[in-house]
C-alpha cells in the first residue's frame, strides 16, 4: 500500500457487527455536497443509526446517514438525513439487487473513510441475526473472557 492509498477513518458502524452477519463487503464512492465534505473535514458528527442502502432504478442510495450541518455554511447548508447516491459498478449493483431480493438479506453501511482525499463508504451485504444468536454470541464471549482471565497468571513459558 503506497503513501497515496492512505485510509483515514471518519466513522464506523459498531452496531452492525452485533446485529448482522456480514457476508460480503464493497467499497463505494458517495456523492456529497460541499457543506457535507467540509463538515466531515472538520470532524463533524456522523451517525449510522438506522441507515441502510436501497437500490432504485439501477442506482444505489444510502438512507438515514446523519452528517452534521456545517457550522460556517449559510443558507446553502445540507439536509443532515438526505438520501445520498452511492457510486458502484453496474455489475456490483445488479449482484446486490439480486441478493437483496432473497428473504432476510439487506445492505448496510459499515464504515465511512477518506481514501486519496475522497470519501468512501464500506457497505456490506448482511443477514440479520436472531435474538437468540446474539445472546449465544454474548455468552460465548463471556466464557472466553472468563477462561482467559483464569489462565492468565497460570501459564508460564
Swiss-Prot record:
More info: Although the Valle et al., electron microscopy paper indicates this protein came from T.thermophilus its sequence maps to A.aeolicus.
Organism the protein comes from = Aquifex aeolicus (strain VF5)
What Pfam family is a match for this entry?
SmpB
Q: What does this protein do?
A: Required for rescue of stalled ribosomes mediated by trans-translation. Binds to transfer-messenger RNA (tmRNA), required for stable association of tmRNA with ribosomes. tmRNA and SmpB together mimic tRNA shape, replacing the anticodon stem-loop with SmpB. tmRNA is encoded by the ssrA gene; the 2 termini fold to resemble tRNA(Ala) and it encodes a 'tag peptide', a short internal open reading frame. During trans-translation Ala-aminoacylated tmRNA acts like a tRNA, entering the A-site of stalled ribosomes, displacing the stalled mRNA.
**Cross-referenced SUPFAM superfamilies:** Small protein B (SmpB) (SSF74982)
Q: Which GO terms describe its molecular function?
A: RNA binding
Principal localization?
Answer: cytoplasm
Q: Where in the cell is it found?
A: Cytoplasm
- GO cellular component terms attached to this protein's record: cytosol
Q: Which family does it belong to?
A: Belongs to the SmpB family.
First and last residue of the signal peptide: none
Keywords assigned: Cytoplasm, RNA-binding
List this protein's GO terms for biological process: trans-translation
Q: Which Gene3D superfamilies match?
A: 2.40.280.10
Protein name according to UniProt: SsrA-binding protein
Q: Which InterPro entries match?
A: SmpB (IPR023620), SsrA-bd_prot (IPR000037), SsrA-bd_prot_CS (IPR020081)
